[in-house]
């Protein structure tokens, strides 16, 4: 069945036959070829939102394939929108005609227009198909989104029960922890002030108490309690933070899920799929218009060249021009618009699907975070340990009370057991004494006549108490009551006090057996089944006696009620009998008196019996009840007799009245019985309901336990997967690091060798120069001496270098001891360097991180210093402005002072003028001057005074305005200073926050880039977009080697990181806020945000998520494969232990040894295929002379080589050679490698080696069934050579043995140069020791039984991969000999001999031994027979 594969991000729909896929990776490979998605980035889901499995792949109809790179923030380029099609230019319809009067011209016009319309229909059909394809892609994308959302819901629902259970547990735990944190000191004070019993404290703690009055405090360790109290607030806060963080993350996850579902529903509601059929309808309209034009063209072909036809053609053409052609153009334009609309809708849905997938990835990360936080919260054992000890302090009173109650219970139990045992022993002693007396009496009367003498040994009973408990302190209930009173006087927790009171109440409650005895009395009867098992346990139990006495009182009350009722009935009956016979004169008075006396006596006897019953107990009460019932029946019978007598004498009215009374009494009896039945029924129903409730509760508990166990199983599987993933990561990292260190070490060694060679070359060169200079003139002796000095310097350098090497070794050892003081220093320099490089790797990584941080800090310090300088400049500018304002104020003040001085001067002048005026007036009055001159001067002075007064007024007003302006400037300066200080502090805080935020973004991008590089990805940027590519392992190793060989690898790596970070975020742009210019700051901020946005967070998340999923998939896959391989290995190991090996012989294998043709040499070879020269070392236990084959288990294999040169030595030397040390006991060719096998018989009882037609050991019979397929049918006269005859069997075995002996694998030895070849050439041993070989490839396949027909039921199927066969022989469990007489031989089932092909050549079969492979051996008692199959 074809499977539809839907691609999520492209909307592509593929079909494939699932029969060609055996594993899920094959499907991913096929999808990768079709869609160019890497197989490791493919995720497949079914329509239900679950992961596709290979087992369910053949039943699925649709699967959804996702590219996990899409969910990464930076992989937006993976979703390539489909470009909008070019605008379709509708060509103009043909509208030219050569001759309007010619019908042919009109027909040509119609033809051209028809062809034009046909082209438009074809183009419209293509646009309609493209539109439908776009809508199909939209449908696929929405379906894939639905499956992804369903998968997310399934994942979240899996952890929801665990989260809800954790919420239920966390809230009360936090409350309890808070209570313990706040009140643990109060609980400790309570323990200090609460006295307890010294013996119990010693018993509980196991140590001596030296205090005169021990308290509860002595039960705990005070230091541990104080330490727990100090750690409790921190633990509580940490636990509370974890719980709050989990709650916030979980709420965020659920809110994000609800938002995702709401957005998906919104996307579904506004989906463009409702317009998916518009293009098909529009295409039908276009085709209808074109059909009309085609029909008009066909009609025009039938027109003649008449005026009427020409007019009709012209009219039809005008209709086309006015209606059909514009309509067709309009419809084609609408089709184009539909195509554009569908393409836009598809592109928008694709982009929104990418956003949805990123949202799904975020929620998935929140889900994993919640899961990890749940595990962390469940595993906070340290916090729980702290609170456990504080809880112990809180529960100290209850713990002490529980121990005291247990001591009381154990003491009471011991007393009860001792009392009951002594009572039982005394009673049995009485019975034994009574039996002894009876026996003596019988012996005296009867037994003395016959039989033995008097037997005084009477069987008795001895009671021994075993298993005495450890002596507990002798405490009583009064001690526990006193302890409760002490606690009530102190501020103790009420819940703890209630629990202690409950312990005291439980001491008074009866045991289970006692409760059964109490419940045995029901409805006035005793249920013996409920009485319990032992009657001794009641004796001496005061509580039980008290409860029995209460039941006795209740029964007595019931009895009194019944007796009073009986007395009333008797009285009524007596009165009725007396009143009904007033005229009976013959009734004797004595009878009445007797009846009254009987009645009174019955009353007295009932009272007497009542008193006696109350004194005697329950049994007399029951007998009394029975007696009263009997008397009641007798009275009833008597009343019936009396009524019968009265019926003869009384009237019908009294008779009816008596019957009514009887019926009434019977009715009351029936009501009582019904009440008892109803009570019993209610008891049964209550019991059934109680059982049902218990069953329901038990079922709920079991279901809850099942859920918890399933959750624990899932958690355990997740932990196993995480552990496997971490192990794989560590292993991969260690392998890479080891390779890097090995390469670096090789480079160092090469460099050291190069340096040594270089120094050696220099020495040689200097020596040559010295020799040449010695041969030159004597004038050059100084140069020779200098050269010698240089040689000495070089030698000193060499010695210094050697000393440096020693120092280097010592430095390495010291460095290793400092790096790992606990480790052992290796002796080898290579091992030491490897260990140091391993330690140095971590240090280099840390140094790289610290260098990056130092560079970041340096840049921050520089920018901080520049920012400080700028701030200082701003402050200086502000100070300059303030100084300018102050100078302005000073100038204003100086101006005011000047003006005031001018005003004072003017006032002084005014005063002087006034004085002069007064003087002039005085002079004028005195007549000293002339009137005219004085008048003129007076006027001048008055004018001058007027002007001065005006100037004074104006100056005063100007001074007032200046003072007001000065005051305003002062207020402005103060307000500006306050604002400047506030703004400075505000901007300082803002700058700190901005710096922190910018640096965090910078460091976050830095760490994420490092993470991508460390997990094997390369980050590249092109045209403002970030791309993450996976580095192949070969390139990664090459890069690591290059880095390790270069001493400056760390510098280049840090430089690479700096370049990456420089590409992502410019370092200068980090300090965009340090610009004084607002416009420049805005530009740098925009540039910073643009550069920061180049880091695609979605691509990063998708890459990391994909990497994690790949590792998880590989871990699961390898885990499953390891499990399957381990099981297969166990199975194969178990099977191979019992199978006969025919190649690759090892110790412990089971082998079949067959004799060679030369029996005198004792050569027994192991049956093999392609592995010759394995000979058996003969032992006495093998008894090879009487065997025809031997199945034995190999214990040792010794490889030997034939050396015939030893045989050429003198005879004295050859005779001294031990037989066991002889390397050629079987006369093999020189230089031949052969193997001597020591083997122990695994299954003894192999048959002897008789001749053909003779029997083997009498107790064994071999039944061989040969099934030889595909052999040619012989002709006439060949019946004797049939495989079923003796001759055929003999011939087959001879051929097989000859084929084994003539194997070419045994002829690979070198020729013997000294005649050894001639000696052994004609020897039979040269061919006897050769093993079997496979048949040539040209052998017909039909000759092999494995390629013939089907094997019989007795033959096993042949394998092609296993290299072992089952043992051909199963020995009988018991061999019977002819001399043993009537020994019965057990009949053994057949053991199938399986033939398996060689691994090296599965197509090559052995023809010679095919018949042997199909032979089954069966042992039977009697004789040996061969059956042809």
From Swiss-Prot:
- Main location class: membrane
Q: Name one GO molecular function term.
A: protein kinase binding
Keywords attached to this Swiss-Prot or TrEMBL record, sorted alphabetically, are:
Autophagy, Coiled coil, Membrane, Protein transport, Transport, Vacuole
Q: Which GO terms describe its biological process?
A: autophagosome assembly; autophagy of mitochondrion; piecemeal microautophagy of the nucleus; protein transport; reticulophagy; ribophagy
Q: Which InterPro entries match?
A: ATG11, Atg11_C, ATG17-like_dom
Bilayer disposition of the protein: Peripheral membrane protein
Biased composition of type Basic and acidic residues is found at 606-616, 1384-1398
Span of the signal peptide: none
Q: What happens when the gene is disrupted?
A: Significantly decreases the radial growth of colonies under nutrient-rich conditions. Strongly reduces conidiation.
Q: Coiled-coil intervals in this record?
A: 540-579, 616-808, 842-985, 1106-1135
Sorted alphabetically, which Pfam families does this protein's record hold? ATG11 (PF10377), ATG17_like (PF04108)
Q: State where the protein is found.
A: Preautophagosomal structure membrane; Vacuole membrane
Which segments show compositional bias classed as Polar residues? 575-592, 1206-1215, 1333-1362
Q: Which stretches does the entry tag as region Disordered? A: 574-622, 1205-1224, 1333-1405
Q: Name one GO cellular component term.
A: Atg1/ULK1 kinase complex
Q: Which family does it belong to?
A: Belongs to the ATG11 family.
The protein's job, in short, is: Involved in cytoplasm to vacuole transport (Cvt), pexophagy, mitophagy and nucleophagy. Recruits mitochondria for their selective degradation via autophagy (mitophagy) during starvation, through its interaction with ATG32. Works as scaffold proteins that recruit ATG proteins to the pre-autophagosome (PAS), the site of vesicle/autophagosome formation. Required for ATG9 anterograde transport from the mitochondria to the PAS. Also recruits the ATG19-prAPE1 complex to the PAS. Required for the Cvt vesicles completion.
Q: State whether it acts alone or in a complex, and with which partners, per the record.
A: Homodimer and potential homooligomers. Interacts with ATG1 kinase and the ATG19 and ATG34 cargo protein transporters. Interacts with ATG9, ATG17 and ATG20.
Write the protein's name.
Autophagy-related protein 11
What gene, per UniProt, encodes this protein? ATG11
